[in-house]
Regions:
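Glycine-rich FAD pyrophosphate-binding loop
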Residues: 50-75
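Conserved flavin/dinucleotide-binding core of flavoenzymes
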Residues: 2-21, 73, 346-503
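Conserved Rossmann-like nucleotide-cofactor binding loop
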Residues: 41, 64, 302
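Mid-domain catalytic core of redox enzymes
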Residues: 2-14, 29, 268-383, 388-394, ...
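N-terminal Rossmann-like FAD-binding beta1-loop-alpha1 element of flavoenzymes
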Residues: 28-58
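Mobile amphipathic helical/loop "lid" adjacent to a hydrophobic cofactor/ligand pocket
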Residues: 98-99, 103-105, 109-218
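Conserved FAD-binding subdomain of flavin-dependent enzymes
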Residues: 77-112
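Helical element adjacent to the flavin cofactor pocket in flavoenzyme catalytic cores
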Residues: 224-284, 290
Length: 503
């Protein structure tokens, strides 16, 4: 029945790049690429290129690969070394491209575990968990209307039908033409949802893209609602790594890159690019250089703007487009090691609604092996609190204190815990998607076929987001290099490209 419904509704993965069987797998001529940025986008590009015979140098400014999925060690007061990360990341099952990269280190993805659920909690309303909804659209939407106390069938009488229809009519061209000049807040106002539904269904979802509703494109919100819910045949279930991201993801990927012959250099920031007779030269502050025929740049918007400003020989339209890129509101992450655990029935991960600062809670000692071992040895707990769109100017220490206080209002037993150690940070490098930004947003291609861009901020002709958008743009950049060298493209798959009611 499920297979029949998927066929009738067109709810199945769709190929957006199909390799030509008459092209060779490996490049026909010797060629090279320098990849600037060792996050998901850059590593995805480097991995595919190296597999196909391209000589690759990968340059990463930080001391570890990973970008915003990076992990790094800290020493706790008891002398134990723990790994901390940028924040919780869910590996959704429609992340087809990112998962295809990860299958190169484990075809069975055995290092991923299903997250049992992820309720949205608040002080105002009972917790609500959406992970158990049926996977298949629109059955998932019907089940939501039947099951959810936040949005009941009778509430639909007061909802603006035209605004609601936009959620089911996603079309990459029409949706952005109609809604990219509108804020997500304005669209939600038009919808006229009950306050609880707006808070629990939409605001929590929107915050997970690190953008505030008043500065987030309504078209981007609709695209992501399509990608995760209304066009996604895999459902809202997600997986998490069995251990920290460094151990589960980056150590194996780094080892694979080494075996493929990639020259991986961490702690290697690039100051500028220079055009050469045969391609591109990267120049570091100390003067070291790397020459290659192709350059794939997978940096965050701020780092990319800085690189483009310092570089000569770049296409003028690219300079203009990159200058218009923005970052979103700052995000804050705080990880706490405590002397005792929280209640045993607390979920591993919770979204949080309507707190001033706190957006999510993760009990890492019930999620990742390293944190679980520390908790088992000490009797404590490892808890991470995350603010996805914090106020400007908020310090890491203040954010941590606020979020801990807000957690106490949601989980009262927290007041009795003693914090043994905490690690705090504020980041300001997540991409912004403000209204009106789509038309000028850079794509993978720059106007120079030897210079390509990749990242979770890059414009795509189909809906995608976060880790999957980063991996997909990296793969598309690699495909352009492969095409120039006469090799077969790597396949790219995504969700149904258009909404159920798209005309």
């Amino acid at each position: 029945v499920d297979r029949t419904l998927r066929g009738l509704l067109g709810m199945r993965p769709r190929a957006v790049v199909t390799p030509r069987a008459d092209r060779p797998v490996r490049v026909r001529r010797e060629t090279s690429a320098v990849v600037v940025g060792g996050g998901i986008a850059g590593v995805s590009a480097a991995l595919v290129l190296a597999e196909r015979g391209v000589r690759v140098t990968l340059l990463e400014a930080a001391g570890q690969l990973g970008g915003r999925l990076r992990a790094w060690p800290v020493t706790l007061p008891d002398g134990a070394v723990a790994q901390v990360e940028h924040g919780f990341h869910g590996f959704f099952r429609q992340y087809y491209t990112w998962r295809s990269m990860l299958r190169r280190i484990d075809p069975e993805l055995g290092f991923l575990r299903p997250l049992p659920g992820y309720p949205v909690i608040s002080r105002a309303w009972p917790a609500e968990d959406f992970a158990s909804l049926p996977a298949l659209p629109p059955v998932n939407l019907l089940a939501l209307l039947i099951r959810s106390p936040s949005l009941r069938l009778r509430d639909l009488r007061h909802v603006d039908r035209a605004a609601a229809a936009t959620l089911l009519e996603f079309d990459r061209t029409r949706t952005y033409a109609r809604l990219d000049g509108v804020t997500a807040a304005e669209l939600l106002d038009r919808l006229g949802m009950p306050d609880r539904a707006r808070a629990v269904l939409f605001e929590v979802f929107g915050h997970s893209f690190f953008n505030r509703e008043e500065s987030f494109s309504a078209a981007e919100l609709v695209a992501q609602f399509h990608f995760y819910f209304l066009g996604n045949p895999e459902g809202l279930g997600m997986d998490v790594t069995a251990d920290d991201h460094g151990s589960s993801v980056w150590a194996p990927l780094g080892g694979l890159l080494d075996r493929l012959g990639v020259d991986v250099r961490t702690g290697a920031p690039v100051d500028r690019l220079e055009r050469t007779a045969v391609g591109w030269r990267t120049v570091a502050s100390g003067g070291s250089t790397v020459d290659a025929e192709h350059a794939v740049v997978g940096l965050d918007p701020t780092a990319l703007r800085r690189l483009v400003t310092a570089s000569d020989g770049l296409p003028a339209p690219l300079r203009t487009r990159v200058a218009g890129l923005t970052v979103s509101a700052p995000y804050a992450v705080a990880r706490f090691w405590t002397d005792r655990p929280v209640r045993a029935d607390r979920p591993v991960f919770s979204g949080v609604s309507r707190e001033p600062t706190l957006d999510s809670i993760t009990v890492y000692s019930r999620l990742e092996d390293g944190a679980r071992q520390w908790a088992g040895r000490t009797g404590g707990e490892v808890i991470e609190l995350h603010a996805y769109a914090a106020e400007d100017g908020l310090t890491a220490a203040d954010a941590a204190s606020r979020m801990w206080t807000e957690l106490g209002g949601l989980w009262p037993e927290v007041a009795g815990l003693r914090v043994l150690h905490r690690e705090t940070r504020v980041g300001h490098d997540a991409p912004g998607f403000p209204p009106g930004s789509d038309a000028s947003r850079p794509g993978v291609r720059t106007g120079d076929p030897t210079l390509l861009l990749a990242g979770d901020w890059v414009r795509l002709p189909f809906a995608s987001a976060l880790m999957e958008r980063a991996a997909t743009t990296g793969l598309l950049a690699a495909n352009d290099v492969l095409a120039r060298a006469g090799a077969r493209a790597e396949p790219v798959t995504t969700v149904r490209p258009r909404g159920l009611l798209a005309r």
